């Protein structure tokens, strides 16, 4: 899983959740 800049939170968590 890639926990980085997703925004959507589909891959892992996502750091930036707008």
Curated annotation (Swiss-Prot):
Keywords: Cytoplasm, Glycolysis, NAD, Oxidoreductase. NAD(+) binds at residues 10-11. One of its GO terms (molecular function) is glyceraldehyde-3-phosphate dehydrogenase (NAD+) (phosphorylating) activity. It is found in: Cytoplasm. InterPro entries: NAD(P)-bd_dom_sf. Belongs to the glyceraldehyde-3-phosphate dehydrogenase family. On the 2D-gel the determined pI of this protein is: 7.0, its MW is: 37.5 kDa. This is Glyceraldehyde-3-phosphate dehydrogenase. It comes from Naegleria fowleri (Brain eating amoeba).
């Amino acid at each position: 899983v890639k926990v980085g800049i997703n925004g959507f939170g589909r891959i892992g968590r996502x750091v930036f959740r707008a």
